[in-house]
C-alpha cells in the first residue's frame, strides 16, 4: 500500500526529535531550480505571488536565501517531524514506535510544491510554496507542469500491480499526479460528520481524519481494502451505503 498526503503550511523546527533517523530527498536538483527562481523575487513580489502578508513574505524570502545543500541534520529536519497541520496532528508521528518507522517510510508519501514528493524521513528545510502557486519554472508554466511527470513516474516505479493506492491528499496537491498514467486504481476516503442533523465534510475534522487514517494503517500494517474499511479511530466507521466504487465514506 502507498498513501499520499499534503504538506502543511505550519512548520516546527524546535521540538526535540524522537530519533536520529533520516533519508535524503530524491529531487533536490529540481528543488534548487525552484529556489533559484524564487530568489529572483523580492519580498513584495513574493507577497503578490503567494497572496501572503508582508511579514510572511519577508520570512519566506529569508528562507529562500537560507536554502543550502547538501542537506544535513544541522540545516534540515525529517519531513514527518516538521510539518505541523491538522493532518499531522491526527497522525501524531512523535508517538509512532521506532519499530513502526520502516512501515511508515515504506507506505507514506508527502506531496510538496518545493520537493515534489517526500518520504517521511526525508530531510527538508523550511519553505512555503503551495502546489497551486502560479510560478513558471524554465519552460514549465507552473509547478503542476514542472512536477507532474516526475511525481507520477516516481509513484509508478514504487507501486506494484494490485497494490492499494490511497489518496488522502487535498485536490490542490493530488492534481500534480497524472492519474491516467497511474498503473493502479485510486482509493479515496472521505470523512463526514453530523452537523445540524446533516452529514457534511467539515474541513477541520476531515483533515485530522486523514492523519488518523494514516496512523491506523501504520499501527495495524493494513494492506487490504477490507482492512481499510475497518478504520474506526475517534468514532469514525465505514458507511457502505454512502460509499461508491473506490470512494470510501466514513461517518461519525
From Swiss-Prot:
GO CC terms: cytosol
Record InterPro entries: YaaA (IPR005583)
Pfam families reported in the protein's UniProt record: H2O2_YaaD (PF03883)
Source organism superkingdom: Bacteria
Biological process (GO), any one: response to hydroperoxide
Family to which this protein belongs: Belongs to the UPF0246 family.
Protein name as it appears in the record: UPF0246 protein FP0718
UniProt organism field: Flavobacterium psychrophilum (strain ATCC 49511 / DSM 21280 / CIP 103535 / JIP02/86)
Amino acid at each position: 500500500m502507498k498513501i499520499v498526503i499534503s504538506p502543511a503550511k505550519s512548520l516546527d523546527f524546535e521540538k526535540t526529535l524522537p530519533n536520529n533517523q533520516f533519508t535524503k530527498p530524491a529531487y533536490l536538483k529540481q528543488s534548487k531550480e525552484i529556489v533559484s527562481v524564487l530568489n529572483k523575487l523580492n519580498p513584495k513580489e513574493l507577497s503578490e505571488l503567494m497572496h501572503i502578508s508582508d511579514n510572511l513574505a519577508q520570512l519566506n524570502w529569508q528562507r529562500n536565501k537560507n536554502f543550502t545543500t547538501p542537506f544535513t541534520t544541522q540545516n534540515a529536519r525529517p519531513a514527518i517531524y516538521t510539518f505541523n497541520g491538522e493532518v499531522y496532528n491526527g497522525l501524531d508521528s512523535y508517538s509512532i514506535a521506532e519499530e513502526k518507522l520502516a512501515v511508515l517510510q515504506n507506505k507514506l508519501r508527502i506531496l510538496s510544491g518545493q520537493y515534489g514528493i517526500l518520504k517521511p524521513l526525508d530531510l527538508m528545510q523550511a519553505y512555503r510554496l503551495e502546489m497551486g502557486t502560479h510560478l513558471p519554472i524554465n519552460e514549465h508554466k507552473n509547478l503542476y507542469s514542472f512536477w507532474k511527470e516526475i511525481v507520477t513516474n516516481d509513484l509508478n516505479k514504487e507501486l506494484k500491480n494490485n497494490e492499494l493506492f490511497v489518496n488522502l491528499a487535498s485536490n490542490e496537491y493530488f492534481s500534480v499526479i497524472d492519474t491516467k498514467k497511474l498503473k493502479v486504481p485510486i482509493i479515496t476516503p472521505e470523512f463526514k460528520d453530523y452537523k445540524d442533523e446533516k452529514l457534511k465534510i467539515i474541513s477541520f475534522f476531515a483533515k485530522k481524519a486523514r492523519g488518523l487514517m494514516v496512523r491506523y494503517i501504520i499501527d495495524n500494517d493494513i494492506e487490504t481494502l477490507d482492512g481499510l474499511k475497518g478504520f474506526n479511530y475517534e468514532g469514525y466507521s465505514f458507511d457502505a451505503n454512502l460509499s461508491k466504487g473506490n470512494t470510501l465514506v466514513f461517518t461519525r
